[in-house]
Amino acid sequence: MKIAIAGASGRMGRMLIEAVLNDADAQLVGALDRAGSPFLGQDAGAFLGKDTGVKLTDDLDAVFAQAEYLIDFTRPEGTMAHVEAALRHDVKLVIGTTGFTAEQKADLQAAAARIGIVFAANMSVGVNVTLKLLEFAAKHFSHGYDIEIIEAHHRHKVDAPSGTALMMGEAVAGALGRSLDDCAVYGRHGVTGERDPSSIGFAAVRGGDIVGDHTVLFAGIGERIEITHKSSSRVSYAQGALRAVRFLSARGAGLFDMQDVLGLR
């Protein structure tokens, strides 16, 4: 599997590079970084003390010409440029970027008519199994329970609520036969009035080096149930991304997510 990594100098990019280098079936063939990055020209394995022969570059076409797959955990504007390059070079994509607009998501859907794409806000096996637990719980706590989602991430995260929190909200709303767009409440301030019993609330915490904590609270009268997933390392995301690459190796064009990759549908 000839794999290139986008955002190669970032926290997630470095974890992905390490995972690829440690996988006997994978070959690192490219490492992309943003224009102007001080790491351009550096060996992709330098932070591991390894010489890979792959230099960080901002030349999209040079990298895509070598790759079969690109793993991308960057930002929406960068990812959309990578999608265009992938279409030019027929490269399959594993996308863990969050914060897309509705229009950008539509563009991803259109691109998937020509290339294979796994798009998931969280590639952890644990998170995706948690989504199934939430669907089950929501069906049994559909009456008399208020639903709130609380997430916490490191101080550098730029979007809120997290993509994973939104996935959890969509899983719960879908199980209840609702649209998240119609029932989500993002943060509260001032005099908000009494809680709408059909709403799903979101709260976001940012601080320190928190990798990612997510709790879905079902609060009833006399009891409350909390379903929590905590990430202590980005290793789980990197391993999930490699599972997604293997999944795409046996697939043609189409838009998939980790529920497809893990056979949880």
UniProtKB/Swiss-Prot annotation:
Primary residence: cytoplasm
**UniProt pathway annotation:** Amino-acid biosynthesis; L-lysine biosynthesis via DAP pathway; (S)-tetrahydrodipicolinate from L-aspartate: step 4/4
Q: Which residues bind NADP(+)?
A: 34
Which reaction(s) are listed as its catalytic activity? (S)-2,3,4,5-tetrahydrodipicolinate + NAD(+) + H2O = (2S,4S)-4-hydroxy-2,3,4,5-tetrahydrodipicolinate + NADH + H(+); (S)-2,3,4,5-tetrahydrodipicolinate + NADP(+) + H2O = (2S,4S)-4-hydroxy-2,3,4,5-tetrahydrodipicolinate + NADPH + H(+)
Highest taxon, organism lineage: Bacteria
Could you confirm whether the keyword NADP appears in this record?
A: yes
One biological process term from GO is:
diaminopimelate biosynthetic process
- Where (S)-2,3,4,5-tetrahydrodipicolinate binds, per the record, is at 154, 163-164
What keywords would UniProt list here?
Amino-acid biosynthesis, Cytoplasm, Diaminopimelate biosynthesis, Lysine biosynthesis, NAD, NADP, Oxidoreductase
What subcellular compartments does it reside in? Cytoplasm
- Active-site positions on this chain: 153 (proton donor/acceptor), 157 (proton donor)
What EC number(s) does the entry state? 1.17.1.8
List residues binding NAD(+): 7-12, 33, 96-98, 120-123
Query: What would be one Gene Ontology cellular-component term for the protein?
Result: cytosol
State one molecular function term (GO). Answer: 4-hydroxy-tetrahydrodipicolinate reductase
This chain's function reads: Catalyzes the conversion of 4-hydroxy-tetrahydrodipicolinate (HTPA) to tetrahydrodipicolinate.
The record, for HAMAP family, names: DapB
Q: Which NCBIfam families match?
A: dapB
Q: Which family does it belong to?
A: Belongs to the DapB family.
The name on file for this protein is 4-hydroxy-tetrahydrodipicolinate reductase
